[in-house]
Amino acid sequence: MAVRKAMKYSLGPVLYYWSKETLEDFYQQAAASHADVIYLGEAVCSKRRATKVGDWLDMAKSLAGSGKQVVLSTLALVQASSELGELKRYVENGDFLLEASDLGVVNMCAERKLPFVAGHALNCYNAVTLRILLKQGMVRWCMPVELSRDWLVNLLNQCDELGIR
């Protein structure tokens, strides 16, 4: 009989613009929640700069201190050198797993042999792509929101055929 693993609950990153104080309050509440894994970071727009990289890292440390697994979410589209600099700080944080929402982040993690979560913004629609990401260090995949249940079932069958599930 196969051993079943306990299901883990994840809380995704806040996708709306909230003030730094509101985010801090939210994540303090999340620390006391039943969520096992908490994703945090600016994943939508770098122009929303009320919360800086250092602030996100401080919140991540606080959450980790309360027993949560923390994943730092990254931008879905890197457009400026300032955004690249911030991404480097995330990649080089030394403590937390990253959610790669851009292939540039995948590359940065792979170059450093760092594990990463493939975020829903990556265009990953088949098992061959998942196998490539696995070889680059992916430890978890978040399915793109536009995919259906039937697509997922088919993809899981492809993964079984490739021996990567």
Regions found by a protein language model. Name each.
Residues 5-25, 49-50, 75-78, 115-124:
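Active-site mouth loops of central-metabolism enzymes
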Residues 26, 55-59, 86-90, 105, ...:
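A general structural detector for well-ordered alpha-helical segments in enzyme core domains, enriched
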Residues 36-59, 74-79:
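Glycine-rich, proline-tolerant flexible connector loops at the mouths of alpha/beta enzymes
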